[in-house]
């Protein structure tokens, strides 16, 4: 039997990082077993559906390199793979369950259902349908239909006994039928299927062998198993993945930080870092490494390595991964990755519409200008310096701004180190001007030794010597390595900035 899995998101928002993990685990399982990875669009929630969200889904998977074998715009032997185009199929199978006695017509209107909910809430009863229409006679059903009363189709959940299934991660599970949400709707009065009907029918017709989804769907699984049995179909192997939590133990949400893949991408996380980190959320690998490429993961992924406990999303750890992957980039690659952030930052002024038309470069649906030869030459010089300090691509602009703009002279209290007074700091800056020509052509280590010798001669720490120089040359506490920065900026410009700071602040 060939393994066949699916990622079946609802395009009701930008792709959540938790959804990305579900897609990734399904993709990796399929590739590790030589199987098929299907992309199915579950767009039956038309009030929240958006074409933008659907396109974002395709863009996200393509950017991450998670190529699907069937579904989406690609199509395939089970087309269509978009649920809103399969309504006739769902109606047919809903009717089949009614005809077999496993489902029934329900004519209760919204007012009655609201009253039931209020009574249940007042009496602290579990919510759910009271099965008022479950035992209507054929004559009663016909009479209501003849009157044109709208109806839904509900699943007839057994009143006694239990439903059992085996989860690949959680083991054998048994659910008392009396605890299953009573008689859920399968087909709405407008002909739209609910998730439960469409999901089961599509998984069967598309030959899905394994259903890997978040553990939040576990309570729905007994009902799905009941439906499989009612149809006479073999259920797939279920595998409910551990939840992705914030550091407070709550489900990951915007209050914890970025949650959509779009946000991570726009902040400047690399796809390699996202793939690597997300693949480790709730899963371990036998060789115990930190760094895995997508091709590595395709070979190593195994359901037996999944963890039952929830996975905590650690933003700092993801940032660490991002930094590691940035250091693996060549200078040319890093320039290509960072340039869109610089170009769109306004560092080189606003871009008018005519310039945009001539630009010819795209990034996240934004047009940006190509760099001038001079801009690229300067930035290529700084790439080796920033590579060790960047954690996010979006940090690049503030790191290189001093090379293209004259920074404002910082206030004296920001220039003066905590352990020095104003007079000593002034002497540091004067000494830096004096020895600046000596660092011409030196690398960071050799140039740093020139400054270290002066710091030692003054009886102060190296950091207390370098900080005032860095602040006056770059205007910031954070910059590429100082000696290299001065070499790129030019010693004359660096001296002028220090002289200006002395004149204005000391």
From Swiss-Prot:
It is an enzyme of class 6 (ligase). Pfam families: Anticodon_2 (PF19269), tRNA-synt_1c (PF00749). GO terms for cellular component: cytoplasm. It comes from the Bacteria. It catalyses: tRNA(Glu) + L-glutamate + ATP = L-glutamyl-tRNA(Glu) + AMP + diphosphate. A motif ('HIGH' region) lies at residues 9-19. ATP binds at residue 254. Its main location: cytoplasm. A motif ('KMSKS' region) lies at residues 251-255. Its EC number is 6.1.1.17. Transmembrane segments: none annotated. SUPFAM superfamilies: An anticodon-binding domain of class I aminoacyl-tRNA synthetases, Nucleotidylyl transferase. Signal peptide: none annotated. One of its GO terms (biological process) is glutamyl-tRNA aminoacylation. It is found in: Cytoplasm. InterPro entries: aa-tRNA-synth_I_cd-bd, aa-tRNA-synth_I_codon-bd_sub2, aa_tRNA-synth_I_cd-bd_sf, Glu-tRNA-ligase_bac/mito, Glu/Gln-tRNA-synth, Glu/Gln-tRNA-synth_Ib_cat-dom, GluQ/Sye, GluRS_core. Gene3D superfamilies: 1.10.10.350, HUPs (3.40.50.620). Monomer. HAMAP family: Glu_tRNA_synth_type1 (MF_00022). This is Glutamate--tRNA ligase. The lineage of its organism: Bacteria, Pseudomonadati, Spirochaetota, Spirochaetia, Spirochaetales.
